[in-house]
Curated annotation (Swiss-Prot):
Xref: Pfam families: AlcCBM31
Ranges of compositional bias, category Gly residues: 352-374
EC number annotated for this UniProt entry: 3.2.1.32
Source organism per UniProt: Alcaligenes sp
Protein's UniProt name: Beta-1,3-xylanase
Induction: By beta-1,3-xylan.
Gene: txyA
Amino acid sequence: MKKLAKMISIATLGACAFSAHALDGKLVPNEGVLVSVGQDVDSVNDYSSAMSTTPAGVTNYVGIVNLDGLASNADAGAGRNNVVELANLYPTSALIVGVSMNGQIQNVAQGQYNANIDTLIQTLGELDRPVYLRWAYEVDGPWNGHNTEDLKQSFRNVYQRIRELGYGDNISMIWQVASYCPTAPGQLSSWWPGDDVVDWVGLSYFAPQDCNWDRVNEAAQWARSHNKPLFINESSPQRYQLADRTYSSDPAKGTNRQSKTEQQIWSEWFAPYFQFMEDNKDILKGFTYINADWDSQWRWAAPYNEGYWGDSRVQVLPYIKQQWQDTLENPKFINHSSDLFAKLGYVADGGDNGGDNGGDNGGDNGGDNGGDNGGTEPPENCQDDFNFNYVSDQEIEVYHVDKGWSAGWNYVCLNDYCLPGNKSNGAFRKTFNAVLGQDYKLTFKVEDRYGQGQQILDRNITFTTQVCN
């Protein structure tokens, strides 16, 4: 069935509710559709500022070979990626992360990058929020250079490793197809790694009209037939220049651009987009809209060596902006809220970690220090509020005493490997693997709205057997 044949008005769409349906996956909302925005740090920030909103979900990317974009800036011409920074900026938003194989899918499947996979999983898992992992995103996209067997093996490996490391409740795995019109139909089964290792089916939605919505419909039906929730992981009105109010039917170079009114742009791309969601309301549980000036990013800019994309920023046209806001006000869409994580089926682990650390540190360290030191002042090296405790010859606890910061988020870092700290005994703490006697750089980052917005503190130490706090 062609989706345009069932077009209804936005007013009618707004009156319909997305029905509850028991789907087989992780971090799936019982009711509603998660609204997320991408896909680079600065575009997300611009959207949040222009729309005066905190996105319920934010999207970014990591390369598996060098973990570029995980905890440092990486820009391959498509906007800046820095997952940890994005997590810092939006500590109460869900995180959607695309992982590129960098053309190395065979080596990934054979285990060459297992250490990087562990670092990725641990970093994401410790962010204490729902994380949706788009492993080898657009699995069947010919530009990615994947092969079916290594793709499936790597998917199974990562799914299992997430559970071995204890993050099965934190990280949900998305199998995302490209929904690319030139792709032949009937190929999805060859890329499918198995119902037991897929939490969500994802798709891309750019110019589905080029093939009469056949590829996105095929992906949706695949999700339905496997009882999996559906996530539109990449979507943007490709070839529309919203700022200029133009459209080109030329996907390669964007030639012969036609002028469009704001109303035409909405009715041609946005209305069918939301209609697709309505038509698949039994399985559709999340979408990411890429709100970016593609033309300003050199990878997508003239001479358009990777095709013509345009400008998809909804805030640049008053009518589009208002329609977008009005549509997302419908309660079927899951926007940012204080109970967002609960709606997504996520239970924060801060209480558990805080309880464990608080109990161990408060009981063991408090008792040991009080008894051993006989009530005297702690050793001189323990006077610094930013310090460490010996846990074992292979483990160090890094901590910073709470100075009354607002602390909506905080990160404790060892040699620039940063994880959210757990507050206990009046300090923010995190335990890391380390080697006794080695030198390390400690970093502490914390939100400080009462001061200058944030505080970042560094110090260098030698790991000894000291126990301070």
